[in-house]
């Protein structure tokens, strides 16, 4: 019987058929068979594939940069968050890229969006369409590494899209007086012409400055400028443009459509007569450039300029853009697109979606001279557009009133670098449609006359000061395409940003007021920023719950000063002693942990240190505390002190610290290395009696609150906390570092190793690795000693992890390792993150969110995937022949949809308002304690099983393997489709979910049938002894 029991049953053997096995010999399979195998499992496009994927009517996102939450978190963690970051210097709007990526890595998507919109009111648009390879990404320091630069655009898009889903309005800066109390200058009438990126940016910043009478006049019946009319839906959806315009309108900016600057409507002169104090011209370049060879050609014949074609595509593909139905332009057969700029590639890929059978991109120079960014070119290449370089157009061939082809001549570059055209080399191409994206101009005489008397330059564009965006008329400013300096959306946004400050300066001067010489544009604000995160503990009011632990970030008091200036709510000094116990440290003494694996740089999950307490004198610390309290009376400063088990020493040092003006004291009874050998730190903190007595001595000596810092290196931390309370402590810090040995090299020597003898000692492990230990300690103390203040420390590296400790019963949060990974500026992320987490709890519509994470949609590569099973009743993976079938099914579905999704009604944005009170910090302290108990209190009747989303599954089989070799063999793995299927033998252990590489691909759902454990043998069978 024992042999039968210890061998897998036949049905289990069948399940294990694809489970990894150790290879005993080389594998042999024919080349022909391997070629077939390759095709079956291929996920990327076959290099020999010449079949164009059917894209008609398919305006789904095609950007390579798009990220889901999983991808965004991985990419954000990979970022180095560099000092003086080159990426920021390369961003036209000077986004604080390092900081917003820090926020994404910490799952503070609101904080990231706030940083982005603070410098760029069109942050989501730019995240989608910015040519980042030529801007921020081009300066990324990770270009110098094997893994390459960060996908900054994708991260920017992700964070701002999550914020968009929160439906939170923009508000005026809380630093401004109420509108009715603003000076008269802020009621000045300001007009902006053109509702494109430059004007939206300019108006947004002016409104943030406090101006209340801002009007944008837009010629079209839709808003957004080229973002709406010429950037395709698959790159920039209209609801994104509308969202950013609604954010601007939240501040009171008005938009009047159907009204333009022209001698027929409004001129600068009439504007001034009507009381406008300043104007901004952001009308773009409305008219297309046309080569003489296209004169007389019409759309009926098959000729379009990009200014004709792209708006038609937009109207037919962007729901909510127009109040009327507009079909897509019918583009059939072969299409020639002239030029190799970004607009040309937009035309080419749009033509495929309008029914083109083949698209030829024809351009004068070679591939090395293509003006478009690599991202755009790559998309066109992937969609099988054909590239024809070194051709210059000569004439269009028309037959029976229709275009049938074009004639070109070859171009060459001579030895001097000049491009010449060889009229003897003639090339003719058949075509049904020709699209000419040859650029744009401003040549409407009515518009030019309406702009009088401003001066124009030799290119026929308004002449502006490049620093102020001011025209020759001091009250008129201009930016965007109409000025000719901005070549991208983000540069147009920056033109508007620049102009806003100097419009402000000009208006204020008209009212006799001065502005700072250094521009100080207000940040982006929402109701989230009004959330109060102050907290009271032991009679002390903390402006926010985040502070410096008594560790490396508090090595000196100038460092504490910088931390307070950055926004930290409190700080502990580095632990100091009486002069008779002064120490000298060894080196090396602080190292990265092995727990992060081969991850180098920031984001280390642990550090180990063998550093002792401060090398500085008690006098230094006491004098410095006095200075800091004088300059930062609202910040809490706690003096951390340490002595041996000596009553007089504790009384002397505690009185000295109190006299310095410290708000409170921390008694370090827990340093796990070095100090214990001196009868200090751990030597005092592991014995309840010693802890109780030390606390009594200090209580007799001082009136200020004091907290005992506990060590996790004990059997029962609650008994130590109880002893501290009995001794008169006002609370405890839980916990200090965990004693450990981080690693040994291949020669057996430790790291860190000190001196030529390569000696070491057990050190203190810190960081997120010890968070489970710290959470356990905090919850255990909070449950045993209700209401007893706890200062948490141990793996706090974000607002999300900080909230976990608050829920566990802590009142304030000490940070060290996270600062070692980064710098003091992480406090901004922690504060905005905590405010957002509290605010979102008040919104009923977001009740299914996990913190700042929205529910995960079924997706691949961050883009929604159709449920093929719903379209055809069959599950198909996304590789090989199944992927091709999926594409064909999707293409047929898109053609069937045709006009179904072309909504006519304008988009309406609904704000989510707080229906419930926004919790204060005190309201969330200890919230999780109700869920903690003994194992015997857990419900064995309510069981769960795993449910796999086949559309998200990437078919790696990790769930299958862990279930086989560490679980219950409850997952089958199809040998052809590699789709895993969970059987009814699933016990709900959750290992599969734990190792799945795709976030939320596996969910644990309630078991529909009673759980009956497999006992191996019936309970009545007696064991063999």
From Swiss-Prot:
The lineage of its organism: Eukaryota, Metazoa, Chordata, Craniata, Vertebrata. PANTHER family: DIHYDROPYRIMIDINE DEHYDROGENASE [NADP(+)]. It is an enzyme of class 1 (oxidoreductase). Keywords: 4Fe-4S, Acetylation, Cytoplasm, FAD, Flavoprotein, FMN, Iron, Iron-sulfur, Metal-binding, NADP, Nucleotide-binding, Oxidoreductase, Phosphoprotein, Repeat. Substrate binds at residues 609, 668-670, 736-737. It catalyses: 5,6-dihydrouracil + NADP(+) = uracil + NADPH + H(+); 5,6-dihydrothymine + NADP(+) = thymine + NADPH + H(+). This is Dihydropyrimidine dehydrogenase [NADP(+)]. [4Fe-4S] cluster 3 binds at residues 953, 956, 959, 963. [4Fe-4S] cluster 4 binds at residues 986, 989, 992, 996. [4Fe-4S] cluster 2 binds at residues 91, 130, 136, 156. Involved in pyrimidine base degradation. Catalyzes the reduction of uracil and thymine. Also involved the degradation of the chemotherapeutic drug 5-fluorouracil. SUPFAM superfamilies: 4Fe-4S ferredoxins (SSF54862), alpha-helical ferredoxin (SSF46548), FMN-linked oxidoreductases (SSF51395), Nucleotide-binding domain (SSF51971). One of its GO terms (molecular function) is uracil binding. NADP(+) binds at residues 340-343, 364-365, 371, 437-439, 481-487. Its cofactor is FAD; FMN; [4Fe-4S] cluster. The modification N6-acetyllysine is found at residue 384.
